[in-house]
């Protein structure tokens, strides 16, 4: 009986491998010629590149986002109930971008932006690009033009629910306009997603909440504008105010802010479902000292015993508000704790780490020199006593 000849795949690979490699190289060259460099690449060439981010303006939120901030070239959705702090969270991102020398635009579809409050949050209102569109399509077209220019680092749309289609505005109150906004948003997402990625612009869409009628099981809450934004968004944040922050006692007790929970319900660049707790103070926004105090206590950098807070075995205040005031008044201590927290969570870039290492080394040398001087002085005193 004749034996079946075994196929040797190594021989086939050797014979046709060179021809296949040449054919692939020709195809890659043709694609790059027709569609531009970078239109097709091997995944390994870009696998080690870290996702570029822009700070959210909140240390706690940067940590919860995992990557250190909002990813560049991606879409972010911030939603929550009324007066939960959605616009405040977005304005802190605007201030952070401007602080780094970037350009930010704010499309105020709700016509509700308060310039004085934005200024209090650190926004440079003289440099902020502001648009208050008459209808939804106009607002999205303005956003598209800003994004495709490649000159803007951050675009905030406040809010999706206020992006009313022109057909609905031109019609009468009570006219049926089922699906108009969803279709408008779906088309906008298809057009904007590619431009946002190419220009590395971060687009933040603020959204409201609605309730679905007749839901018996699960959450009845939903966001307006259809499902397109949910799919295209790389990050989705659920913002909800929880506990009041009050000062005074008895009848003199007044609310000065609220503890707000920001949950990362979707994240394509880091593990999701992390939570950031921030203190949003009236007229101030997210309290930098408040969030730093909370994180430092969780990390064990600041010790808490009862109502007392201590750093390096030194008491800094009885009660959170007094500890926050201490950090406000002592900028060096604030910066030192802030640096320790950022180092622990890998939020410092290589240059900052190198600079810190150099500073630490210099301080260590200075401390050692001082100790040696003290030793020499002690020896001289002992010799004088012996004489």
Swiss-Prot record:
Principal cellular location given in the protein's record: cytoplasm
Single Gene Ontology BP annotation: SOS response
Keyword line: ATP-binding, Cytoplasm, DNA damage, DNA recombination, DNA repair, DNA-binding, Nucleotide-binding, SOS response
GO molecular function: ATP binding; ATP hydrolysis activity; ATP-dependent DNA damage sensor activity; damaged DNA binding; single-stranded DNA binding
Compartmental location: Cytoplasm
Gene Ontology, cellular component aspect: cytosol
Positions with a binding annotation for ATP: 80-87
PANTHER family linked: MITOCHONDRIAL DNA REPAIR PROTEIN RECA HOMOLOG-RELATED, RECA
Role of this protein: Can catalyze the hydrolysis of ATP in the presence of single-stranded DNA, the ATP-dependent uptake of single-stranded DNA by duplex DNA, and the ATP-dependent hybridization of homologous single-stranded DNAs. It interacts with LexA causing its activation and leading to its autocatalytic cleavage.
Family in the record: Belongs to the RecA family.
Protein name: Protein RecA, chromosomal
Taxonomic source organism: Lactococcus lactis subsp. lactis (strain IL1403)
């Amino acid at each position: 009986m004749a034996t079946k000849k075994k196929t040797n795949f190594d021989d086939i690979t050797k014979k046709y491998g060179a021809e296949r490699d040449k054919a692939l190289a020709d195809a890659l060259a043709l694609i790059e010629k027709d569609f531009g460099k970078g239109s097709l690449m091997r995944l390994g060439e870009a696998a080690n590149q870290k996702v570029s981010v822009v700070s959210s303006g909140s240390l706690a939120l940067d940590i919860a986002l995992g990557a250190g901030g909002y990813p560049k070239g991606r879409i972010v959705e911030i939603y929550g109930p009324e007066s939960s702090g959605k616009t405040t969270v977005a304005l802190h991102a605007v201030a952070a971008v401007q602080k780094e020398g970037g350009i930010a635009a704010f499309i105020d579809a709700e016509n509700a932006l308060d310039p004085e409050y934005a200024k209090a949050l650190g926004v440079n209102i003289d440099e902020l690009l502001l648009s208050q569109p008459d209808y939804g399509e106009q607002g999205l077209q303005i956003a598209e033009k800003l994004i495709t220019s490649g000159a803007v680092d951050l675009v905030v749309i406040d809010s999706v629910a206020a992006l009313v289609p022109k057909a609905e505005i031109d019609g009468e109150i009570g006219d049926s306009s089922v699906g108009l906004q969803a279709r408008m948003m779906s088309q906008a997402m298809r057009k904007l997603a590619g431009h946002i990625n190419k220009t590395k612009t971060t687009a933040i869409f603020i959204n409201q909440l609605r309730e679905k009628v007749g839901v018996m099981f699960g959450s009845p809450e939903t966001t307006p504008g259809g499902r397109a934004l949910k799919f295209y968004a790389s990050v989705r944040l659920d913002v909800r105010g929880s506990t009041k922050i009050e000062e005074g006692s008895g009848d003199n007790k007044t609310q000065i802010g609220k503890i707000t929970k920001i949950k990362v319900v979707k994240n394509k660049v880091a593990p999701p479902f992390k939570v950031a707790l921030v203190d949003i103070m009236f007229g101030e926004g997210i309290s930098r000292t408040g969030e730093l105090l909370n994180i430092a206590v969780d990390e064990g950098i600041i010790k808490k015993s009862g109502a007392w807070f201590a750093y390096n075995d030194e008491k800094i205040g009885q009660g959170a508000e007094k500890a926050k005031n201490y950090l406000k008044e002592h900028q060096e201590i604030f910066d030192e704790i802030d640096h320790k927290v950022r180092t622990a969570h890998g939020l410092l870039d290589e240059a900052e780490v190198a600079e810190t290492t150099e500073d630490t080394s210099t301080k260590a040398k200075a401390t050692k020199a001082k100790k040696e001087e003290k030793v020499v002085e002690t020896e001289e005193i002992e010799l004088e006593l012996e004489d």
